[in-house]
């Protein structure tokens, strides 16, 4: 059939049974066939808008079902005329997404439309071809209105159903997945629907998009040629309306609303329907509309849960497709993306700058940088503009985009070297990343540093950027106030070391030597010397002596003879045979005959002066003894030799230049030299860069150490890793930092401890890698340990030793709070390492003892472990010999002192049959120790390097732990000490008498010198005696408080058995019992068998028994402590005693006080008075430290004087302040002292000018806040004490303290912060009305707490407390500014009206004065606002009843301290606990004062 006849062909009419059902459709078809004219009168078809408007009718569902069945008959024969006939019903179906619930029909309609699409496309093709044929022949073209309407209707239905079904399918699948997670499945009736959904996802939706694409990309072969975009000729002679194309664009826009787009698996589907955008932008010039289409997706809510913007990558994939016409399509899509990038940079600028952008916008920026980084780099200025956005998330996403562009292949090193523009862009990006490490927002700073770390991990940072101050800039973030930023900075530094391009060796000293050598080599290379010149010079120097002798002889001959010198005709012959015999004569004759000979005038004059004498002289000689002639000869010889050397070198160079082979060789040497110079310069620059990096890292080490010691857990763990890397990379200062870092071993945190131990294993214990032998590994481990101990300070040595102990103690149980972390396999110190250390320590050869000392110090913690103590006991006699060496004696004695530590087997309950490690009192060990003891004690010098106190302490410890009879050994040592001190005093008195009785001046002067010597010796020995007594008291206290209860628990079962059998406990023959155990076993006079054997009751009984024993048995007059106590008292009270001894006696007395309640009660006032008023810093610090034992042994008595300890936190000495904070931390962590309001004195140390004190104070309050709610309870008292009275802090320091404390409360419940307003306002009642400064200080707290509606209400409820201070204009101004700021930042109208009312009341008091109702009890400025006044029982926003409030008051603990209590004299003792409780109880029962009720309720 011809084409022109196919256009008018009609389908066969339906059967008679369907005529009735199709009446509605026929009517609709007849109405559509009525031609209409537009305004221009060109055509009779309707616009797509008119078609939609006429079809927007709600047709009954029954009619829709009937029309769909009728429409199926048309689809069966692929007849598109069913589309305009049944369009009203199909349009109503596609429009009613919720009211028409028969989704099966919708899937059927999709099948029908797909079946009709092919015929419709063919009809359109024939129609367009017919149009061009008639246009070519000049015939009139008749518009096929039905076909035009069918095309528009088909597009409408396809667009609507595609979007509607896609959204429905996505919703159904999401619902099914959610039900599957909950365990509930679907019913069986929806099996068919599930099949339709699967068919839709796999096939039908792609077909629907293909139908639209086929219309858009329709190509028709006509008489005028192949026509692209043939769909536009359907509307000829009219122009295709824009709304028709917008229906295609709307398909994509509405499909963007589908939450399924968020899934990564949907990228293929997105790419498919994005082909519509591809065609619209390439063929129809809708670039701007396509770009705007992407921005409509920013408002979709499902993207808030997405991780990326899913619509850029499919668009880029289409842009980069290779196929026919790709060149045509590529540029339009590229223009689309360029428009998107341009609009992204300007979208939130100007008037929209304050509007917060959605998350999708930020993801779009990042997606553009990943997929089209080349386009973004071309429009990099638009991206830079985003960095100026005020919203944090925009700046963060922009930095992320810049980092992705920086790491892209577009800015690779090779391309940047080739193209200068790319290099400049790379530098610009890097500078902006660095600049935003100092952004005002914490998250931005952290993001910038993290991005730099990611770039460094990928090794994308160029070498020239690494040494340009990068580490200094990022390292400065270690001082950031944010933990997050500090952690990111430490992670970057660690990553930098792991991925640096300079290797693992950053040793500064070694690289300095290398640099000097390379610089010297470079200087020599840059100043080359010809081989010909060098050879000539060397040959001339070798024959210089012979040549000079010949020249000198010839010169003398010239002076002696009368003949005229004949010149040599050519010097070439002379130079050729220069080193042959006689050449010196010819050289002299040649140069003397030259015109430039400088001595020509002087030789004839000398010859003329002696001519008369020479006439009759047969010898014809001239005397050579004349000085002038000798010097002249020397000058001539020197000049001739110099000229000969110069001419000889020139002669040799000329010979070389005439040789062509030599010239080529010289040229090659020059090229090699230039290449060598370039390499040397590169090596020198590399060394300089490496040393610069090392220097920057060394500065970062100090700051990182501070973060480790004072930071949070997260940054501590990262800091440990960084310092470990620095140690392994040999960064300067890393060794000292590692030693200081070991102090973390005392932290009560399992995570930190495990991280520290793992780092110590990496640093100290070598691994067995490759073909390395085990002996080499052990030697390396030994050297690592020795290096760690070498040069360690006394402050850090205990921490380092504890870390080594944990490495050696495999018996310790591994504790890890992180259950998800796989425990790392421990690498303990091997036995061979321990043996090597013993070999070094016990080496008997004479030499430097520093390595032996370090080895002994390492062996000390190792010997404490289960594996090391057996080895140490076996080497006791060898260690004993080291006591004879003064340098090694103290460290050797330390090892001996721990040999009595019980092993795991000795601590078992059934260990009675096993021997203990005890040493008899007659053993030679005690003689060696006693000899060392008195050698150190009796020295009269004050050398600070001598550790005489360590010898005292270790000697006492050794006696208590190793002696078989302490009751014999310790008194014996003390008696010898006292005896020697007595003998020294006798010598002093003897020479005093000698001075008084001496009559001869010589004898008197000698006696005076000896008297002064013994006086000085007595002073020093007496001081050491006091230290000895004090140490005996301390160790006896520990021995009694710890050892005796332990032994009692161990022997309690045997004691019970002995009483039952009425027999003594039999001493085991294989066991050496100590004297204390003998007393327990045989006499049974120290302990009694407890009646109650439960742990709590037993502990109380033991504590009571130990106290009774100390009071009744320890200070017996004829026993050790009873004899030593009078010596201490004498040293304190004797007025003629030197101050140094009196201070030592005071310290010793403070150590003896915990042993006896009677002594403590008598001496406590003097003790605390000396602690607070002594002029000696050392004495005050020691007495503060003694408070630990005092508070443990005598808690009730210590509470009476605790205020004196709190006051010491404001001592003038930073050492005393630091000691006080440490003691308070120990006492409060063990609940040995009550927290008081005077703890505010310790809070002043938070801003102490001394860093050590400041760090200790901050750590103290952090730990206190983590354990209890003390800071919440006492914060109002802190604020009041720090702002009131004569000791008011400066406002800047006050804010620093408050901000630190309030930062600790950020994790506390909100109710605590709300009640804080009431408690702070109550403090106004205790403030003098004339005081205008304290209210300003308290305003700092109110401004922080009053940040919401509830806070403002509480501030209004407490109007009566603070309104009286509004009479001061300066105070009123500050409070008015606070309320105005709250008014300006709030968006709540009611809140703003309350702020206005509060400002009006402040102004009224300021202008009219204070009114009676302003200070009346129960006054509130919101009475007329309908808000009821709160009574004290509901002040905290609580719904508790009055009775419950009363019960809470009765149950509440006593208040910390009232303000009146804190103002008492510091010298007076505080009230006992019972009195404080009675006082609190009375104040809780009495309800006439609402302030106290409120305080009790809050606490």
From Swiss-Prot:
Database matches in Pfam families: Cnd1 (PF12717)
Example of a GO cellular component annotation carried by this entry: nucleus
Compositional bias ranges of the Acidic residues kind: 1458-1467, 1486-1499
Post-translation changes: Sumoylated. Sumoylated in the context of the dosage compensation complex but not in the condensin I complex. Sumoylation is important for assembly of the dosage compensation complex and its robust binding to the X chromosome.
Keyword Membrane: no
Keyword Nucleus set for record: yes
Composition bias type Low complexity, residue spans: 1432-1446
InterPro entries tied to this protein: ARM-like (IPR011989), ARM-type_fold (IPR016024), CND1/NCAPD3 (IPR026971), Cnd1_C (IPR032682), Condensin_cplx_su1 (IPR007673)
Annotated compartments: Nucleus; Chromosome
GO biological process: cell division; chromosome segregation; dosage compensation by hypoactivation of X chromosome; meiotic chromosome condensation; meiotic chromosome segregation; meiotic sister chromatid segregation; mitotic chromosome condensation; mitotic sister chromatid segregation
UniProt-reported outcome of changing residue 1122 to E: In y1; leads to XX-specific lethality. Surviving hermaphrodites exhibit increased X-linked gene transcripts and a shorter and stouter body morphology. XO animals are wild-type males. Defects in mitotic chromosome segregation
Disulfide bonds: none
Tissue: Expressed in somatic and germline tissues (at protein level).
Taxonomic superkingdom: Eukaryota
Record's function text: Required for both chromosome condensation and segregation during mitosis and meiosis and X-chromosome dosage compensation depending on its binding partners. Regulatory subunit of the condensin I complex, a complex required for conversion of interphase chromatin into mitotic-like condense chromosomes. The condensin I complex probably introduces positive supercoils into relaxed DNA in the presence of type I topoisomerases and converts nicked DNA into positive knotted forms in the presence of type II topoisomerases.
Oligomeric form and interacting partners: Component of the condensin I complex, which contains the mix-1/SMC2 and smc-4/SMC4 heterodimer, and three non SMC subunits that probably regulate the complex: dpy-26, capg-1 and dpy-28. Within the complex, interacts with dpy-26 and smc-4. Component of the dosage compensation complex, which consist of the condensin I like components mix-1/SMC2 and dpy-27/SMC4, and the three non SMC subunits dpy-26, capg-1 and dpy-28. Within the complex, interacts with mix-1, dpy-27, dpy-26 and capg-1. Interacts with smcl-1.
Entry's family note: Belongs to the CND1 (condensin subunit 1) family.
Protein name: Condensin complex subunit 1
Gene: dpy-28
């Amino acid at each position: 059939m011809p084409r022109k006849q196919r256009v008018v062909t009609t389908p066969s009419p339906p059967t008679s049974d369907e005529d009735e059902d199709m009446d509605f459709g026929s009517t609709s078809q007849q109405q559509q066939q009525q031609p209409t004219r537009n305004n221009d009168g060109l055509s009779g078809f309707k616009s797509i808008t008119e078609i939609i408007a006429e079809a927007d009718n709600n047709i009954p569902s029954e009619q829709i079902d009937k029309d769909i069945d009728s429409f199926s008959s048309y689809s069966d024969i692929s007849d598109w005329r069913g589309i305009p006939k049944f369009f009203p019903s199909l349009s109503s179906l596609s429009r009613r997404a919720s009211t028409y619930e028969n989704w099966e029909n919708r899937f059927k309609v999709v099948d029908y439309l797909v079946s009709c699409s092919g015929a419709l496309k063919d009809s359109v093709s024939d129609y367009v071809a017919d149009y061009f044929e008639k246009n070519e022949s000049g015939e009139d073209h008749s518009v096929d209105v039905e076909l035009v309407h069918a095309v528009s209707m088909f597009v409408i239905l396809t667009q609507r159903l595609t979007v509607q079904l896609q959204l429905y399918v996505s919703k159904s699948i999401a619902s099914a997945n959610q039900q599957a997670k909950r365990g509930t499945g679907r019913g069986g009736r929806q099996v068919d629907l599930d099949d339709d959904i699967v068919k839709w996802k796999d096939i039908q939706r792609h077909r629907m998009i293909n139908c639209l694409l086929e219309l858009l990309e329709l190509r028709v072969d006509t008489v005028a040629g192949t026509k692209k975009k043939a769909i536009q000729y359907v509307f000829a002679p009219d122009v295709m309306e824009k709304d028709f194309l917008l229906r295609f664009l709307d398909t994509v826009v509405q499909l963007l609303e589908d939450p399924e787009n968020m899934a990564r698996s949907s990228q293929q589907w997105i790419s498919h329907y994005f082909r519509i955008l591809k065609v619209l932008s390439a063929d129809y010039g809708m670039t701007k509309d396509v770009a705007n289409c992407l921005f409509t997706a920013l408002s979709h809510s499902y993207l808030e849960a997405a991780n990326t913007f899913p619509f850029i990558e499919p668009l880029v994939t289409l842009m980069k497709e290779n196929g026919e016409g790709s060149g045509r399509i590529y540029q339009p899509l590229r223009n689309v993306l360029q428009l998107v990038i341009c609009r992204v940079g300007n979208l939130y600028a100007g008037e929209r700058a304050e509007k917060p952008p959605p998350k999708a916008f930020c993801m779009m920026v990042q997606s553009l940088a990943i997929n089209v980084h080349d386009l973004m780099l071309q429009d990099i200025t638009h991206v830079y503009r985003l960095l100026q956005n005020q919203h944090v998330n925009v700046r963060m996403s922009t930095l992320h985009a810049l980092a992705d562009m920086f790491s892209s292949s577009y800015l690779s090193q090779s391309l940047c070297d080739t193209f200068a523009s790319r290099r400049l862009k790379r530098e610009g990006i890097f500078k902006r990343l660095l600049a935003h490490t100092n952004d005002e927002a914490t998250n931005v700073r952290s993001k910038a540093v993290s991005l730099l770390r990611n770039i460094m991990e990928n090794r994308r940072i160029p070498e020239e950027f690494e040494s340009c101050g990068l580490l200094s800039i990022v390292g400065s973030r270690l001082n950031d106030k944010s933990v997050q930023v500090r952690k990111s900075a430490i992670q970057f530094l660690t990553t930098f070391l792991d991925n640096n391009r300079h290797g693992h060796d950053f040793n500064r000293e070694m690289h300095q030597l290398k640099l000097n050598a390379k610089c010297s080599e470079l200087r020599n290379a840059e100043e080359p010397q010809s081989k010909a010149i060098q050879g000539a010079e060397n040959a001339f120097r070798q024959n210089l002596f012979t040549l000079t002798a010949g020249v000198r002889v010839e010169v003398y001959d010239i002076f002696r003879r009368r003949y005229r010198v004949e010149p040599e005709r050519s010097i070439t012959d002379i130079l050729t045979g220069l080193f042959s015999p006689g050449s010196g004569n010819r050289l002299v004759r040649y140069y003397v005959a030259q015109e430039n000979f400088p001595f020509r005038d002087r030789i004839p004059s000398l010859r003329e002066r002696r001519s008369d004498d020479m006439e009759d002289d047969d010898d014809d000689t001239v005397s050579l003894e004349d000085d002038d002639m000798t010097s002249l000869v020397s000058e001539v010889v020197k000049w001739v030799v110099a000229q000969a050397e110069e001419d000889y070198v020139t002669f040799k160079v000329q010979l070389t230049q005439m040789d062509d082979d030599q010239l080529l060789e010289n040229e090659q040497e020059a090229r090699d030299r230039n290449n060598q110079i370039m390499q040397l310069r590169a090596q020198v620059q590399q060394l300089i860069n490496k040393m610069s990096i090392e220097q920057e890292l060394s500065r970062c080490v100090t700051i990182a150490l501070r973060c480790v010691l004072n930071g949070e857990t997260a940054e501590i763990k990262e800091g440990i890793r960084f310092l470990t890397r620095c140690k392994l990379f040999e960064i300067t200062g890393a060794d000292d930092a590692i030693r200081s870092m070991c102090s973390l071993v005392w932290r009560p945190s399992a995570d930190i401890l495990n991280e520290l131990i793992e780092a110590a294993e990496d640093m100290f214990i070598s691994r067995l890698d490759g073909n390395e032998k085990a002996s080499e590994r052990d030697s390396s481990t030994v050297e690592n340990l020795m290096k760690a101990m070498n040069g360690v300070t006394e402050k850090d040595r205990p921490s380092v030793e504890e870390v080594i102990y944990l490495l050696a103690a495999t018996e310790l149980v591994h504790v890890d709070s992180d259950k998800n972390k796989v425990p790392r396999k421990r690498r303990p110190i091997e036995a061979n390492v321990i043996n090597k250390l013993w070999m070094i320590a016990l080496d008997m050869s004479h030499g430097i003892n520093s390595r032996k000392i370090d080895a002994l110090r390492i062996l000390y913690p190792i010997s404490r472990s289960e594996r090391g103590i057996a080895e140490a006991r076996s080497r006791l006699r060898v260690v004993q010999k080291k006591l004879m060496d003064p340098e090694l004696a103290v460290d050797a004695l330390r090892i001996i002192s721990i040999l009595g530590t019980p092993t795991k087997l000795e601590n078992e309950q059934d260990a009675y049959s096993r021997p203990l490690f005890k040493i008899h009192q007659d053993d030679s060990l005690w003689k060696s120790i006693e000899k060392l003891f008195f050698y150190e004690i009796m020295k009269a010098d004050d050398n600070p390097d001598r550790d005489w106190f360590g010898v005292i302490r270790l000697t006492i410890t050794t006696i208590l732990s190793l002696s078989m009879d302490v009751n014999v050994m310790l008194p014996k040592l003390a008696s010898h000490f006292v005896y020697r001190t007595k003998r020294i005093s006798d010598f002093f008195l003897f020479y005093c008498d000698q001075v008084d009785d001496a009559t001869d001046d010589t004898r008197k002067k000698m006696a005076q010198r000896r008297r002064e010597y013994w006086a000085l010796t007595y002073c020093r020995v007496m001081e050491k005696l006091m230290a000895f007594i004090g140490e005996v008291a301390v160790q006896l206290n520990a021995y009694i408080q710890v050892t005796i209860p332990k032994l009692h628990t161990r022997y309690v079962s045997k004691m019970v058995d002995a009483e039952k059998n009425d027999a003594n406990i039999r001493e085991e023959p294989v066991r050496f019992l100590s004297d204390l155990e003998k007393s327990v076993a045989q006499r049974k006079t120290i302990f009694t068998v407890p009646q109650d054997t439960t742990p709590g009751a037993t502990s109380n009984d033991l504590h009571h028994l130990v106290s009774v024993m100390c009071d009744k048995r320890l200070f017996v007059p004829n026993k050790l402590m009873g004899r030593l106590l009078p010596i201490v008292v004498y040293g304190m009270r004797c007025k003629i005693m030197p101050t140094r001894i009196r201070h030592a006696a005071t310290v010793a007395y403070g150590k003896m006080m915990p042993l006896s309640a009677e002594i403590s009660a008598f001496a406590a006032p003097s003790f605390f008075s000396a602690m607070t008023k002594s002029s000696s810093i050392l004495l005050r610090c020691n007495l503060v430290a003694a408070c630990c034992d005092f508070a443990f042994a005598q808690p009730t008595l210590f509470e009476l004087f605790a205020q004196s300890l709190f006051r010491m936190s404001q001592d003038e000495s930073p050492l005393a302040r630091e000691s006080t904070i440490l003691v308070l931390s120990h006492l409060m962590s063990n609940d040995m002292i009550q927290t008081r309001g005077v703890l505010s004195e310790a809070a002043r140390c938070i801003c102490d000018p001394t860093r050590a004190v400041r760090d200790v104070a901050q750590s103290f309050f952090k730990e206190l806040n983590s354990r209890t709610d003390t800071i919440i309870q006492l914060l109002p008292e802190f604020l009041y004490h720090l702002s009131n009275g004569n000791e008011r802090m400066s406002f800047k320091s006050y804010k620093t303290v408050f901000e630190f404390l309030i930062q600790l409360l950020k994790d506390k419940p909100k109710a605590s912060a709300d009640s804080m307003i009431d408690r702070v306002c109550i403090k106004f009642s205790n403030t003098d009305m004339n005081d205008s400064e304290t209210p300003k200080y308290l305003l700092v707290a109110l401004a922080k707490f009053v940040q919401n509606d509830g806070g403002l209400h509480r501030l209004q409820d407490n109007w009566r407390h603070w309104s009286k201070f509004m009479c001061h204009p300066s105070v009123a101004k500050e409070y008015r500014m606070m309320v105005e700021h709250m008014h300006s930042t709030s968006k709540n109208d009611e809140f703003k009206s309350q702020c206005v009312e509060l400002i009006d009341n402040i102004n009224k008091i300021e202008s009219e004065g204070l009114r009676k109702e302003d200070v009346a009890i129960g006054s509130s400025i919101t009475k007329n606002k309908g808000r009821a006044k709160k009574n004290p029982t509901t002040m905290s926003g609580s719904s508790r009843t009055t009775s419950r409030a009363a019960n809470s008051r009765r149950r509440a603990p006593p208040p910390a301290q009232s303000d009146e209590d804190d103002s008492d004299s510091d010298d007076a003792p505080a009230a006992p606990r019972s009195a404080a409780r009675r006082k609190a109880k009375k104040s809780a029962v009495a309800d006439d004062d609402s302030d106290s009720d409120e305080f009790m309720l809050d606490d």
